[in-house]
C-alpha cells in the first residue's frame, strides 16, 4: 500500500501573499492577521534550528509559537532563510510554500491558545479547519501525491 503524502501548492486566482522577506514584514503580516482576529500583536523571532527543535520537542520543527506574560511569540528557524544582508532575509524559493504554511500554522497556534484555551489538543480538528480556511484564502491548498 502506497503512503499518501501532500504538498502545498498555490492557486493563481486567490488573494496574493504579501511580500514577506524580512523579519519585520513577517511580524507585520502576523500583526495584520492578529488585528483581524482581535488578538494582540505577535513578536517574531529567528532562532537556530536546534533551538526551535529543542523548545518544541519536535525533531522536524522549523517554527514554534507560545504565550508568555500575556505576549505572543513565534520563532522561525534561521535555516529556512538565506542571509543577504545582516538585517535582511529572503525565503529560500524551494521552501516558500512550506514556509507560508508554517507562518499560518504558527498563527493558528497562537489564536487557539488565546481564543480557545479549553481545546488542549495542539492539532485539534478545529485547529486544522482554521488553518485550511486561512490557507485557502491565500490560495494555498494541499495536493495529494
Feature roles, as predicted:
Residues 50-97, 110, 114, 121, ...:
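Active-site scaffold of zinc-dependent metalloenzymes
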Residues 98-106:
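Short alpha-helical catalytic segment bearing the HExxH-like zincin motif
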Residues 17-72, 142-145:
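Auxiliary, metal-adjacent structural segments of Zn-dependent hydrolase domains
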Residues 122, 133-139, 145:
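Active-site or metal-binding loop neighborhoods of secreted/extracellular toxin and effector enzymes
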Residues 7-10, 106-110:
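Surface-exposed beta-strand-to-loop junctions
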Residues 16-17, 116-118:
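Short histidine/acidic/glycine/proline-rich micro-motifs that form metal-
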Residues 1-14:
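Acidic, serine/threonine- and proline/glycine-rich low-complexity repeats
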Amino acid at each position: 500500500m502506497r503512503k499518501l503524502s501532500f504538498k502545498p501548492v498555490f492557486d493563481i486566482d486567490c488573494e496574493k501573499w504579501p511580500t514577506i522577506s524580512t523579519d519585520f514584514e513577517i511580524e507585520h503580516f502576523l500583526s495584520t492577521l492578529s488585528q483581524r482576529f482581535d488578538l494582540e500583536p505577535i513578536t517574531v523571532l529567528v532562532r537556530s534550528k536546534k533551538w526551535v527543535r529543542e523548545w518544541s520537542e519536535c525533531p522536524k520543527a522549523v517554527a514554534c509559537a507560545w504565550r508568555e506574560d500575556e505576549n505572543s511569540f513565534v520563532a522561525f528557524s534561521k535555516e529556512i532563510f538565506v542571509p543577504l544582508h545582516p538585517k535582511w532575509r529572503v525565503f529560500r524559493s524551494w521552501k516558500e510554500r512550506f514556509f507560508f504554511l508554517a507562518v499560518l500554522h504558527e498563527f493558528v497556534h497562537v489564536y487557539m491558545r488565546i481564543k480557545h484555551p479549553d481545546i488542549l489538543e495542539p492539532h485539534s480538528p478545529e485547529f486544522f479547519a482554521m488553518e485550511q480556511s486561512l490557507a485557502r484564502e491565500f490560495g494555498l491548498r494541499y495536493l495529494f501525491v
